[in-house]
């Protein structure tokens, strides 16, 4: 099998391909390219795979692709809708359902979001007869979080891709805490899930700010990069981070790798607090007009 991506084609139909797109249409440009590449792979004994986010807009074009082609149908929202999965299934195409562990742009993964997303997508795979589930871990703007935070999400994928029974979030987290981490209290993963909520200034907003100020990229209309960044929010997050650290310390006392886990957690929790302070400082200096990068 060969995956040749073909996703997020933001520049297709613009710049060099603008004139051709005006003549033939953006969707036609896309499907002709994918079809040519897929046919080449089939002729050479391979099974082509591609991400499905572009063809969602014109699912009927799936009928032009080789029958062996596999569509990797991704969606990462906690309340991910099933419309795209249904549309691809109705064409008779072969598809994988691809949820995610929700670590992109985060210092610590959005664990509850990943649980909701993965349970939904695995359910859609069963409902629409997908041939598999591909659980994903991405790092938008650089993979800033430690991969260890993706472990609960990876386990959710292993559980629900094979088991149609929906195990409640808290119950499954207790199981993972005990079996994966050796935490006899059963609370470790539930405490991990609290960390992400304390990021007042997000990594994505920092990157957007840099690109706007230094690279002169335009922001989306109405976008406020410092929404919710204020002294009260930063102080509340700092208090919450200290409380989470204490709870995690208690959970890790019975774990076989206490020191290793606490080193990771200490760096991450302190990092979130520092980054929140950076956001507050940047927001304050932006208001005074004295900040110059």
Named regions from a protein language model:
Residues 2-3, 293:
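Short, small-residue-biased leader/transition segments that mark boundaries at the very start
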Residues 5-27:
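Active-site-proximal, well-structured secondary-structure segments within enzyme catalytic domains
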Residues 20-293:
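Substrate-binding groove of N-acetylhexosamine-processing glycoside hydrolases
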């Amino acid at each position: 099998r060969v995956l040749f991506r073909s996703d997020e084609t933001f520049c297709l139909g613009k710049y060099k391909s603008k004139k051709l797109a005006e003549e033939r249409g953006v969707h036609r440009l896309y499907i002709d390219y994918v079809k040519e590449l897929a046919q080449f792979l089939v002729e050479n004994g391979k099974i082509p795979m591609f991400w499905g986010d572009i063809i969602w807009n014109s699912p009927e074009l799936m009928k032009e692709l080789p029958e062996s082609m596999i569509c990797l149908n991704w969606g990462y929202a906690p309340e991910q809708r099933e419309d795209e999965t249904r549309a691809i299934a109705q064409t008779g195409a072969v598809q994988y359902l691809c949820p995610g562990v929700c670590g992109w742009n985060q210092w610590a993964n959005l664990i509850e979001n990943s649980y909701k997303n993965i349970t939904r997508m695995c359910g859609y795979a069963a409902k629409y007869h997908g041939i598999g589930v591909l659980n994903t871990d991405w790092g938008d703007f650089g993979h800033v979080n430690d991969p260890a935070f993706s472990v609960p999400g990876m386990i959710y994928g292993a559980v629900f891709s094979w088991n149609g029974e929906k195990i409640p979030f808290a119950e499954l987290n207790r199981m993972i805490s005990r079996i994966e981490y050796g935490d006899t209290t059963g609370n470790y993963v539930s405490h991990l899930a609290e960390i992400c909520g304390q990021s007042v200034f997000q990594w994505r907003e920092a990157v957007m700010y840099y690109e706007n100020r230094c690279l002169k990229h335009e922001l989306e209309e109405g976008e406020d990069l410092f929404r919710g960044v204020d002294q009260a929010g930063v102080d509340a997050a700092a208090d919450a981070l200290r409380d989470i650290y204490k709870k995690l310390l208690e959970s890790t006392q019975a774990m076989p790798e206490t020191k290793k886990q606490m080193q990771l957690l200490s760096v991450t929790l302190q990092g979130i607090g520092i980054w929140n302070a950076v956001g507050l400082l940047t927001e304050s200096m932006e208001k005074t007009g004295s900040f110059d990068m």
